[in-house]
Amino acid sequence: YIPVVSTVGCDAEGGVYNINADDAAAMIAASLGAAALISMTDVSGIMKDKNDPSTLIPVIKTSEAPYLVESGVIAGGMIPKTRCCINAVNSGVERVFIIDGRIPHAILIEMLTSEGIGTMFVKG
């Protein structure tokens, strides 16, 4: 199954709230016992130098991610996305991917090739 979920919520008084889509996806994937979660964005994945696509980090272990944040490799909007990836893996999702959704067939390339095209988070 591929759940499609709106991340807009409301409270008892009818107030409307924007719920972080990455947080929602991580929680849903963990609750479903998903083997994988794919986050499609407008960047190739986590890069050592955000301006140099050749520095893409193909695999990040959950234990390595805090160092990458502290050292500034992971910065800005990628910090909460990384946090969600780590939370999903630590909650039982085997693999979490960040891939560039602008690339045609990005999901197929990531899932069906040995090298992939994005960054994969795994436990470790």
Identify the meaning behind each predicted range.
Residues Y1-G124:
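C-terminal catalytic "cap/lid" subdomain
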